Amino acid sequence: MRAFVSALLALWSLSVFSPAAHAQSGQWLGGSAIQSSVQVGAPGEAWVGVWVDAPVVTTMRTRSPMAVSFVVDTSGSMAGPKMDNARLAAAAMIESLSDGDIVSIYGFATDVTEVSAPTVLDPVSRQMLLRNVGHLVAGGGTNLEGGLRAGISRMTSAPMSHAVRRVFLISDGQANVGVTDPRALGYLAAGATEVGTQITAIGVGYDYDPMTLNAVAVQSAGRMHHLGTPDQMAAILETELSWMSRSVALSAVLEVRPASGIVILGAATTGATVVDGVLRMPLGAITAGQRRELLFRVRVPTADIGRRTLATASLRFETPEGAHAAPQSAEVAMTVTREAPRATPAPRVAAMVAQYDASEAERAAAQLLQQGRQAEAIARLDAARASVASTATSYSFEDSAVQGALSSRAAELGAAAAGARAASSPAAMHERSYELQAAPMAADGY
């Protein structure tokens, strides 16, 4: 364990600072319709993309204090390597966090066990928490509801000074005690956002319920990780701690209000919902250099020639210190013209559509593999790879990162197709389906 902890401490020594306050200055928000113009009288439906590009910051200062709750499934199925690695991950986190951070630990089986109440880290309490990690013992059912409630409730008592808040939820099974409906558990997780908290859900193995853990991550504007084997917890922990330490915005929310006469038909991006005609997407914490995108369709009246505002996007968030930052806004417009438009589609929005189509193909392929329809799944993935690769080379991208993301996605789709081809048994196809379900979540920023 010492080697693992030492590795994480080395990572943390590079990440103990977070962006300075001036990181909140500048425009992060942008947007565009896929076409800048449409011919008068033409069908008036169009893709629209809105994006948040957080700045890459080089000026640093001491990071803000964190409040973390570690919530571990201690049901019987977690016995063995899964529980061993969960203890190791908890211990590594305790070693890696700084004095002054707040940590709590809970185990949930049939009942919820408070392993450690919220504790402010110092040299003495750190050793106590490390000893308490050994009290995580497997046995019983899976009271996911109870574990969520315990972790979230402790965030409500976190002081305002600890604005960076996270619940880490680890499970390998399906909820079978208390509330078990994925939508209800997602609604419970959504309550975490009211106290500035996100939930990182970590599914271990190939028997957990992806629908439930996805709902928990999305509704809390958190993160979702699929772990094929429990020893991958090390990489997950490294990623999460690094991201948390580099937060430039907290409790971020992206909203899109349509202009008069414009109708938002629906969102393609996971986590975005339309309520009373307004599109809303909680983003939670945003990391320096992170990009979040929102893709949706609108209906545009095309009877009259002229420029039309389609919608106004707004971004609201808090600083890592918990102060309200100045909101940002961006207008998206389109021109109705007499002649047929000749302009090529907006490259970034075309890329967003290609990424969305890839996610739909991955979801469909996952279902096909679950049904044993291997050849159809492979065909969907191959077609998606070709489409994404074509988009990457068909446009002149001003932003090389957008093109790079497309190239990476094409490579991932190719690898997924190869994995599906190599699946020689129903069990192997089941495992590949879990990996395919995780890919769209990662693509949408979860």
Tell what function each PLM region has:
Residues V5-V16:
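Bacterial N-terminal signal peptides
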Residues Q24-S25, L29-S251, V300-I305, R385, ...:
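Exposed acidic/Ser/Thr-rich ligand/metal-binding surfaces
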Residues A268-Q290:
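Extracellular adhesion/glycan-binding regions together with long Ser/Thr-
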Residues R292, V300-Y446:
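Long, acidic serine/threonine- and proline-rich intrinsically disordered regions
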